[in-house]
């Protein structure tokens, strides 16, 4: 239905006609009274019109003259029009026609005035309350002047025409109307919303009431889902619970607005789909927190999310959103390698729950791999976490402070489930038979499934059905032309992909294992090492077999790209590990035989190694470092073992690896203290110099010790500092002596001695308290500086200063440090050899001799 407002005559023509008709019909001069009535009715004369107040006595009299019997007015002062017409005159058809013409002209006059007023204020009608105010203004005179009583629909048609025009032409009003409905529904004011809908329906304009209700419903669902789903990750069936809650709370009101039954299954299904879409939208925005911060508590929400993800675009949006946040919060220099790796391991587990095919994880690994490869100590952190090694061994390999709490969390995360287990594969029931007639094996073997009746199914039928039901995997899920066979779904394999090559990881494991075997007490290796070695061996052998085997892709027989050199290097490292383990086993057997020889001290447990496979060559070691003198008794006993070995192995000769031996010593002090330590041969030789046969105190200078031990003073100072930190030696007036009587508990001495040594570095030439505080702040910031330079490489001064402002705790007061003060401190570190200044104005960390990852 459409409305069209037809133009009317000029107002003066209409007014003159009213005066003429009234004078002719009533035969009296009522022109003045009629003009007063017209002025009172007109909405355009704001000062003299009704102003929403009842008419005066004079106007009431003229209304009675025009409309006698106007006792009641409902809804617009309804009266019996035929009686009114007959009561005025009854002079034939001519007078009746004049009366009808008078009423028609009066209606025309009022419609003209209403339209004029409406279009005069058209641009100022911005809200529903504005038009409702004018509508009330227009309808007020009609309560007393029943000019539309012959056909009430005439006024309704006129009013709806104005509404229709307003809705179609006033864009601002239409937008505000839409906003108003949304707000009413958001505020649960469904009564006012229903009034607005009824107004819209009467206007029948370009703005559909159904469309508005649906949009408002969708907005209401969005808000309801935000309030009930956001950051709730540990509840099952979240979509269904939220949907049921919404239906119970609001559906009766919405069904009334829409005008449909409450049990409309098609509509409720559509609404439920909206809840699924909102769940997907909310979880996509929260995917970083779900996978990185809340996992594994958020596993239930990942499973629910997996059920509703039907399109590869859903996965793409999730991966894109996740990587944006992961890069922002994790892949930045202020996050330590331990924390970054911990978050990444959680990411792997979470995304394998979300997408068991591993395609999402493949995209994530491809993105983060370059960032992790910039972290030099990644392989050390991963290996120490896999092996759950103590903090002391980790610090020997990594020259920056490690958050042990985060490292323990990483260990727990790696070991809460088998690292070698495919996270996405559900364990199969061993008693459950395959649906195929034959269980085909990888190496061509086959086993007959005897429980399946052969007579009811032929082998080709099973194969045919399998290929008929086969659905191709979407290529859009992963970038490029990566085949699904390359996608990793094993936690260890995914972590292994972070490195440039498998050979690099295995080589680092070999180095770590070598150090462990060198320091191993007796000959038994911890089980965690054997488990890790078994895991590496299985994956490397599997990878090697795959690399050298044929495969079929898209029906074409082909070969994988060349990986033979890497596979050969992997196998070479594994062979070296096997030789080292064999050396340990043979050493145990040989040691047992040696201990049976009379005259040998059985407390010595030698290891006989093959230098070529242990990556150890005495010729490569500094001659001065290995020329120190051992204690005479120890050297004599070791020589006995060497002679016995030559007797047991004719033609072979032993060479002592002085820098690899370990000695367990027990120190006893005069105050009753006892200390048991595992130390190196060098450390043992140093403390042995203070062993007094007659219990007299020994005081030795650095020069005396250097000459006696044949150790260079810088190296010897480092060895002496070790014993000072242990609370064994005391340096006073340039000489070293044993602390036989301690004023404090020995454990407390161990804690305070390193602090005293560290605090000695804080002594400044400037006695100013403020300068000392600044220097202390810079000293405390040193681990952050080393961490940044280690993870990111060389950095310029202003960049280091900016990062320190972000990373150093605020209560340390680093914000008060100027760029010049930092530059002076960095130059001091460079002079001490701890940092290196590059010509381009950058600083880098000085390598300490260990192989960095």
From Swiss-Prot:
InterPro entries assigned: APC2-like, APC2_C, Cullin_homology, Cullin_homology_sf, Cullin_N, WH-like_DNA-bd_sf, WH_DNA-bd_sf
Keyword Cell division set for record: yes
Pfam families per the UniProt record, alphabetical: ANAPC2 (PF08672), Cullin (PF00888)
UniProt-listed GO biological process terms: anaphase-promoting complex-dependent catabolic process; exit from mitosis; metaphase/anaphase transition of mitotic cell cycle; positive regulation of mitotic actomyosin contractile ring contraction; protein K11-linked ubiquitination; protein ubiquitination; regulation of meiotic cell cycle; regulation of mitotic cell cycle
Major site of localization recorded for this protein: cytoplasm
Domain of life: Eukaryota
Cellular component per GO, a single term: cytoplasm
Pathway: Protein modification; protein ubiquitination
One term of GO molecular function: ubiquitin protein ligase binding
Record keywords, A-Z: Cell cycle, Cell division, Cytoplasm, Mitosis, Nucleus, Ubl conjugation pathway
Transmembrane regions: none
Localization terms from the record: Cytoplasm; Nucleus
Note: Present with 432 molecules/cell in log phase SD medium.
Subunit architecture: The APC/C is composed of at least 13 subunits that stay tightly associated throughout the cell cycle: APC1, APC2, APC4, APC5, APC9, APC11, CDC16, CDC23, CDC26, CDC27, DOC1, MND2 and SWM1. APC2 interacts directly with APC11 thereby anchoring APC11 to the core complex.
Function: Component of the anaphase promoting complex/cyclosome (APC/C), a cell cycle-regulated E3 ubiquitin-protein ligase complex that controls progression through mitosis and the G1 phase of the cell cycle. The APC/C is thought to confer substrate specificity and, in the presence of ubiquitin-conjugating E2 enzymes, it catalyzes the formation of protein-ubiquitin conjugates that are subsequently degraded by the 26S proteasome.
Similarity comment: family membership: Belongs to the cullin family.
Protein name (Swiss-Prot/TrEMBL): Anaphase-promoting complex subunit 2
């Amino acid at each position: 239905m459409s409305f069209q407002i037809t133009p009317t005559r000029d107002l003066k023509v209409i007014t003159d006609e009213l005066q003429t008709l009234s004078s002719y019909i009533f035969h009296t001069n009522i022109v003045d009274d009629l003009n007063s009535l017209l002025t009172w009715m007109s909405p355009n004369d704001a000062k003299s019109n009704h102003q929403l107040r009842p008419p005066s006595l004079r106007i009431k009299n003229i209304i009675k003259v025009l409309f006698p019997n106007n006792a009641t007015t409902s809804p617009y002062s309804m009266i019996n029009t035929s009686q009114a017409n007959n009561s005025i005159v009854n002079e034939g058809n001519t007078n009746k026609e004049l009366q009808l013409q008078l009423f028609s002209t009066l209606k025309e006059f009022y419609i003209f005035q209403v339209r004029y007023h409406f279009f005069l204020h058209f641009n100022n009608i911005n809200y529903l309350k504005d038009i409702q105010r004018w509508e009330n203004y227009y309808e007020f005179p009609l309560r007393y002047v029943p000019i539309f009583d012959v056909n009430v629909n005439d006024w309704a048609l006129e009013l709806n025409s104005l509404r229709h025009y307003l809705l179609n032409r006033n864009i601002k009003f239409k937008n505000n109307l839409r906003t108003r409905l949304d707000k009413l529904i958001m505020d649960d004011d469904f009564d006012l919303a229903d009034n607005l809908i009824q107004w819209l329906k009467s206007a029948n304009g370009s703005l559909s009431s159904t469309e508005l209700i649906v949009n408002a419903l969708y907005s209401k669902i969005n808000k309801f889902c935000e309030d009930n789903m956001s950051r709730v990750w540990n509840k099952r069936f979240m979509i269904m619970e939220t949907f049921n809650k919404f239906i119970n709370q609001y559906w009766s009101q919405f069904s009334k607005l829409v005008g449909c039954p409450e049990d409309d299954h098609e509509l409720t299904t559509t609404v439920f789909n909206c809840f699924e879409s909102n769940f997907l939208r909310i979880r996509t925005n929260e995917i970083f927190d779900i996978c990185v911060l809340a996992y594994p508590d958020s596993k239930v929400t990942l499973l629910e999310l997996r059920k509703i993800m039907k399109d590869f675009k859903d996965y793409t949006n999730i991966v894109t959103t996740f990587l944006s946040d992961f890069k922002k919060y994790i892949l930045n220099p202020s996050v330590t390698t331990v924390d970054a790796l911990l978050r990444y391991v959680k990411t792997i587990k979470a995304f394998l729950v979300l997408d068991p095919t591993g395609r999402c994880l493949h995209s994530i690994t491809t993105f983060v791999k370059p960032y992790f490869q910039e972290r030099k100590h990644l392989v050390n952190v991963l290996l120490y976490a896999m092996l759950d090694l103590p903090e002391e061994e980790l610090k020997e390999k990594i020259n920056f402070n490690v958050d042990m709490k985060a490292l323990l969390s990483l260990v727990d995360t790696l070991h809460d489930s088998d690292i070698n287990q495919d996270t996405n594969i559900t364990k199969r029931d061993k008693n459950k038979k395959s649906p195929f007639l034959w269980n085909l094996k990888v190496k061509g073997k086959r086993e007959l499934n005897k429980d399946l009746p052969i007579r009811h199914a032929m082998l080709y039928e099973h194969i045919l059905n399998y290929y008929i039901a086969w659905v191709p995997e979407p290529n859009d899920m992963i970038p490029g032309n990566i085949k699904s066979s390359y996608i990793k779904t094993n936690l260890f394999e995914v972590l292994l992909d972070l490195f440039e090559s498998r050979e690099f990881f295995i080589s680092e494991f070999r180095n770590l294992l070598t150090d462990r075997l060198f320091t191993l007490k007796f000959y038994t290796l911890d089980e965690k090492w054997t488990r890790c070695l078994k895991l590496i061996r299985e994956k490397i052998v599997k990878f090697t077999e795959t690399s050298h085997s044929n495969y079929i892709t898209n029906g074409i027989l082909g070969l994988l790209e060349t990986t033979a050199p890497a596979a050969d290097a992997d196998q070479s490292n594994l062979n070296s590990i096997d030789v080292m383990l064999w050396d340990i086993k043979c050493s145990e057997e040989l040691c047992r035989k040696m201990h049976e020889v009379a005259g040998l001290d059985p407390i010595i447990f030698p290891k006989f190694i093959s230098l070529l496979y242990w990556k150890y060559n005495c010729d490569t070691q500094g001659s001065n470092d290995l020329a120190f003198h051992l204690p005479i008794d120890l050297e004599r006993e070791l020589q006995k073992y060497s002679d016995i070995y030559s007797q047991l192995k004719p033609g072979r000769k032993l060479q002592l690896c002085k820098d690899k031996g370990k000695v367990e010593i027990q120190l006893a002090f005069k105050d009753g203290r006892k200390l048991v330590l595992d130390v190196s041969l060098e450390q043992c030789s140093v403390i042995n110099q203070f062993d007094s046969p007659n219990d007299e105190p020994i005081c030795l200078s650095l020069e005396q010790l250097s000459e006696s031990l044949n150790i260079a003073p810088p190296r010897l100072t480092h060895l002496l500092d070790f014993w000072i930190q242990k609370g064994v030696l005391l340096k006073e007036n340039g000489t070293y002596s044993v602390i036989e009587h301690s004023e404090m508990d020995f454990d407390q001495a161990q804690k305070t001695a390193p602090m005293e040594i560290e605090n000695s570095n804080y002594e400044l030439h400037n006695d100013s308290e403020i300068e000392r505080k600044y220097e202390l702040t810079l000293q405390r910031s040193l681990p952050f500086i080393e961490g940044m330079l280690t993870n990111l490489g060389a950095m310029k001064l202003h960049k280091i200063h900016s990062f320190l402002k972000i990373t150093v705790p605020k209560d340390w007061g680093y914000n008060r440090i100027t760029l010049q003060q930092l530059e002076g401190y960095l130059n001091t570190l460079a002079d001490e050899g701890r940092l290196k200044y590059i010509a381009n104005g950058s600083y880098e960390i000085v390598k300490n001799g260990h192989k960095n990852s």
